[in-house]
Curated annotation (Swiss-Prot):
Family statement: Belongs to the G-protein coupled receptor 1 family.
Protein name (database record): Olfactory receptor 4M2
UniProt source species: Homo sapiens (Human)
Gene: OR4M2B
Keyword Membrane: yes
Disulfide bridge positions per record: 97-179
Membrane topology: Multi-pass membrane protein
Taxonomic path: Eukaryota, Metazoa, Chordata, Craniata, Vertebrata
Length: 313
């Protein structure tokens, strides 16, 4: 990388999702309604699993972690995006940009690793039911979750370390509503091919390898469950759980691979895919799991009745 003198950029200007006031107002109402509707649902999932003594299996512990990561992941960009709808000049400082990049990749990669852990948990529950409690004990479950977070942290450190060493001398406009790493790399005043290649390999490797492993494991599980299709309600519930997992995997990994596992060129769909990737899909993930889980739904109804409706009376 060249070391010539340059004027360091201290802030970036975000173009946002739209420059039209009327469109901005409509988008604000839509995203705020969506965020305020789904966010409490994820919080309720965490509270339900934490407070209900019957939801002690590793599956529920992992689900609570997923809900937390999804809340965190979406909240990194959503509040600022909503505020910027009413700001004429949308500015983010260089330090805030780096912090946003770090936490976004930290939470996103951690969630991908966690989904892989959840697939292992489901595999153990279906294929080794008699040994499930022994294999997926509390200690192993905590270790796997900790490794997921550690993997996300290492991935995020790599991304940020590559960004901070780049020179930024102008322009400083990012064609996005948040500090997107693909946009930041594009405006650096240097040849970014080596950094971009490492970023694509890092993000793409995590996304593609995890996706292939997950799809192969679910294909194996569904094939196994198809042979046991006459075994009753438990088999049907396992199939339903598998489809829930597959739905989450597709929603999570599809946009991520589209954005980060290719050269950082600009395409017309980038902003739309980014909105789904950072806001809509993450907040839906735990909800999709919960809708197919009778135990969690029953516990949620019990919690709402006990702590909310009773207090109103």
């Amino acid at each position: 990388m060249e070391t010539a003198n340059y004027t360091k950029v201290t802030e970036f200007v975000l173009t946002g999702l739209s420059q039209t006031p009327e469109v901005q107002l409509v988008l604000f109402v839509i995203f705020l309604s969506f965020y305020l509707f789904i966010l409490p649902g994820n919080i309720l999932i965490i509270c339900t699993i934490s407070l209900d003594p019957h939801l002690t299996s590793p599956m529920y512990f992992l689900l609570a972690n997923l809900a937390f990561l999804d809340i965190w992941y979406s909240s990194i960009t959503a509040p600022e995006m909503l505020i910027d709808f009413f700001v004429e000049r949308k500015i983010i400082s260089f330090d805030e940009c780096i912090a946003q990049l770090f936490f976004l990749h930290f939470a996103g990669a951690s969630e991908m690793f966690l989904l892989t852990v959840m697939a292992f948990d489901l595999y153990t529950a279906i294929c080794r039911p008699l040994h499930y409690a022994t294999i997926m004990n509390q200690r192993l479950c905590c270790i796997l979750v900790a490794l997921s977070w550690r993997g996300g942290f290492i991935h995020s450190i790599i991304q940020v370390a590559l960004i901070v060493r780049l020179p930024f001398c102008g322009p400083n406009e990012l064609d996005s509503y948040f500090c997107d790493i693909t946009q930041v790399v594009r405006i650096a005043c240097a040849n970014t091919f080596p950094e971009e290649l490492v970023m694509i390999c890092s993000s793409g490797l995590i996304s593609v390898v995890c996706l292939i492993a997950l799809l192969m494991s679910y294909a194996f599980l569904l094939a196994l469950l198809k042979k046991l299709s006459g075994s009753g309600e438990n088999t049907n519930r396992a199939v339903s759980t598998c489809y829930s997992h597959i739905t989450i995997v597709v929603l999570m990994f599809g946009p991520s691979i589209y954005i980060y596992a290719r050269p950082f060129d600009s395409f017309s769909l980038d902003k739309v895919v980014s909105v789904f990737n950072t806001l809509i899909f993450p907040l839906h993930n735990p909800i999709i799991y919960t809708l197919r889980n009778k135990e969690v739904k029953a516990a949620m109804r019990k919690l709402v009745t006990k702590y909310i409706l009773c207090k109103e009376k």
